[in-house]
Amino acid sequence: MNNEKKYLLGLTLAELKQVAKDLGMPAFTGGQMAKWLYEQHVKSIDEMTNISKANRAKLAAEYEIGCAEFSDAQYSVDGTIKYLFPTRSGKFVETVYIPDKDRATLCVSSQVGCKMNCLFCQTGKQGFEGSLPAGDILNQIYSLPEVDKLTNIVFMGQGEPMDNLDNVLRATEILTADYGWAWSPKRITVSSVGVKNKLKRFLEESECHVAISMHDPIPSERAELMPAERGMGIEQVVELLKNYDFSHQRRLSFEYIVFKGVNDSMQHAKAIIKLVKGLDCRFNLIRFHQIPDIPLQGVNDEKMEQFRDYLTSHGVFTTIRASRGQDIYAACGLLSTSKKIGEIRHHEDEKLKEEM
């Protein structure tokens, strides 16, 4: 017999009302639960004080909040903080908090590891260990010490969001719904390499900003960097995007890590200009952060600026993204929980030996 409790964090308003109904409570109790969860961020059912003690006891007999504090934190000299959060499956994901003047962005993970296996990404080297339920995605925000300072959320951590689309859509629904965090979808950006069928569904069902990982405009070269090119090519991705309006509130951006001698030539810049012609978009150029045993190198600042200036002068709005958290391996492409989990388990084993 399974005596494990179910979780409230990650349930929609309709589902919370159904929980109340199933336990013999008035439907409005579901609305009360939503307020306690998504407005007050309570840690226990007993904190839901406008629900009767008897009903709280009924609820607690079958459910728990489902939140979990971070297991580890690393602090960068530039103010960036990398958190390690446990998941309900007993695994871990990394989440990066990036403060910057009047903004504070949280980079959340949607999977443990990743299937995409991009050549330049440490997460892909970890392998794929599972997709996060919406509750685990939301817990990275819910249990963040700086949650009240957040201005933006980006789904650019571990995993491919489109490969876990049901849970990403559920999480963004709760973040943007009136009963949830009530955030504008314009405060949320979801990234993707481009996953066949899934990207179209996301564009139809969500109003959040979109960031496409391009990294090379030439399909044969992109396939060498990103195996996902063989599933849905960058040309197919761009053709799909041309069916949607990005000229108003919703923003489309392309991510482009610049590699020395690989994708940094004028040929590549011209191919980008031709490829995105007619699209209202922006380009973010990203510095490559060295990964062990990967035969790729970054370019110097002068080369980055030349590439940016050429694109900008030909009508493609382009910026160079500031690298944050390099000293704690929190920058783009560096997230991986493998080593840190080993350290934590070793520490737990040592602690257990001391207690025996």
Q: Which residues fall in each region the model found?
A:
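Auxiliary Fe-S-binding modules of radical SAM enzymes
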Residues: M1-V93, K242-R250, V258-M356
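Short linear Ser/Thr-Pro motifs
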Residues: S76, S109-S110, S191, S213
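Generic beta-strand structural signal
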Residues: I81, V93, A104-V108, M116, ...
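P-loop NTP-binding catalytic core
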Residues: S89-I98, D102-R103
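Canonical Radical SAM [4Fe-4S] cluster-binding loop centered on the CxxxCxxC motif
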Residues: P99-D136
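Ferredoxin-type iron-sulfur electron-transfer modules in oxidoreductases and energy-metabolism complexes
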Residues: G135, N139-V147
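Conserved AdoMet/S-adenosylmethionine-binding subsite of the radical SAM
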Residues: P145-N152, G157-R321
